[in-house]
From Swiss-Prot:
Subunit relationships: Part of the nascent polypeptide-associated complex (NAC), consisting of EGD2 and EGD1. NAC associates with ribosomes via EGD1.
Protein name according to UniProt: Nascent polypeptide-associated complex subunit beta
Biased composition annotated in UniProt, kind: Basic residues: 41-50
Family from the record: Belongs to the NAC-beta family.
Keywords: Cytoplasm, Nucleus, Protein transport, Repressor, Transcription, Transcription regulation, Transport
GO cellular component, one term: nucleus
Organism: Pyricularia oryzae (strain 70-15 / ATCC MYA-4617 / FGSC 8958) (Rice blast fungus)
Cross-referenced InterPro entries: BTF3, NAC_A/B_dom_sf, Nas_poly-pep-assoc_cplx_dom
Length: 172
C-alpha cells in the first residue's frame, strides 16, 4: 500500500513539473495565438428529404416475386367499390396477377370518387351490391328533387313585399 502511495506522489509531482515546463516554454502571447478558438464559419444545416418507404416497396416486390406474378396488359381502369358508396378509381394502372395465389397487385394513383361521377361508364361493371347502392343513391336523389319542388310550391303562398307596403295589409 505504501508503494502505491509513493507512486501517486511521483506522478503528481511530475505532472506539476510538466505544467510548469509548459508555461516556461510558451509565453502567454504565443499560447493565445496558437490555440485561439472561435466560432469560425457555422455548420451548414442539412435539409433532409422526407423518409421514403423504399424498404416496404422492396419487401413487397420480393414477396410478389416469390408468388410469381405476371403483368396483365391492356387494362384501362380499375374501380374498387367501398361500403360507403364511394369508389377508388385508378386510371391506366399497372396490374400484376398471381392467379394460383388469388393475388392481384395494382400500381397507380388512386382517387376517391363518388359513384355519381362514374355512373355512365361503369354500369356494366356494377355487381349486385353496387347496383343496390346505386338504387339507394337514385332514390335519395329523387327525394332531394321532391323536397326542392315542395319548397318552391310553398313559396307561392307567401306574398311578395313591396317597399312602402305593410305585410299585414297584404294578408287582409
Amino acid at each position: 500500500m505504501a508503494d502505491v502511495q509513493e507512486r501517486l506522489k511521483k506522478l503528481g509531482a511530475s505532472a506539476r513539473i510538466g505544467y510548469v515546463l509548459v508555461n516556461f516554454f510558451f509565453s502567454q502571447a504565443s499560447i493565445g495565438s496558437r490555440w485561439k478558438t472561435g466560432k469560425g464559419t457555422p455548420r451548414r444545416k442539412m435539409k433532409r428529404a422526407p423518409a421514403r418507404s423504399g424498404g416496404d416497396d422492396k419487401k413487397l416486390q420480393q414477396t410478389l416475386k416469390k408468388l410469381n406474378v405476371q403483368p396483365i396488359q391492356a387494362i384501362e381502369e380499375v374501380n374498387m367499390f367501398k361500403s360507403d358508396g364511394n369508389v377508388i378509381h385508378f386510371a391506366a394502372p399497372k396490374v400484376h396477377a398471381a392467379v394460383p395465389a388469388n393475388t392481384f397487385a395494382i400500381y397507380g394513383n388512386g382517387e376517391d370518387k363518388e359513384l355519381t361521377e362514374l355512373v355512365p361508364g361503369i354500369l356494366n361493371q356494377l355487381g349486385p351490391d353496387s347496383l343496390a347502392s346505386l338504387r339507394k343513391l337514385a332514390e335519395s336523389y329523387q327525394n332531394m328533387q321532391k323536397a326542392d319542388g315542395d319548397k318552391e310550391a310553398d313559396d307561392d303562398d307567401i306574398p311578395d313585399l313591396v317597399a312602402g307596403e305593410n305585410f299585414e295589409d297584404k294578408v287582409e
